[in-house]
Amino acid sequence: MPNPVVFFEIGCKDTAQTREFYGKMFDWNVAETPTGAMIDPKGGIPGQITSLGHEPHQYTIFYVQVDDVAAAISQAESLGGTKIVGPIPIPIGTFAWISDPGGNTIGLWKPK
């Protein structure tokens, strides 16, 4: 697969409650962080629970790894999608959020 799904994010208002729910529901290792929690699903795709983000806080996003975040945003726009935010550089890579023509939010990710 040339552009694999590599990460997911669950947005919420109550990170403690959300951590407890997903940890117990799916037997995931959920480690508390200053902004929520990192999820290690024991062999699956890693993710995070966070209270950071936009309104509404309740959302789920999967991230697709791309070679060039800006180029992927341009391609999405040419296909009828919309840039929501980004590209945003962070210490371990660059990400963006786009929406497809139906309004679904998708994350784009390029590691350093």
PLM features per residue range, with description:
Residues V6, A37, T60, T94-A96:
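Short beta-strand micro-motifs in enzyme catalytic cores
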Residues G36-I39, A71, I84:
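A structural feature recognizing the 12-helix transmembrane core of secondary solute carriers
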Residues F21, A70-Q75:
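Short amphipathic alpha-helices within nucleic acid-binding modules
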Residues D27-Y59, T105-K110:
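Conserved short beta-strand elements that form part of the metal-binding/catalytic scaffold
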Residues I10, I73-K112:
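Vicinal oxygen chelate
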Residues D14-T15, D67-A70:
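Helix N-cap motif at beta-to-alpha junctions
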Residues F7-D40:
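N-terminal first-folded block
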Residues M1-R19, G44-I45, T60-F62, P111-K112:
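N-terminal beta-strand motif that seeds the catalytic metal site of vicinal oxygen chelate
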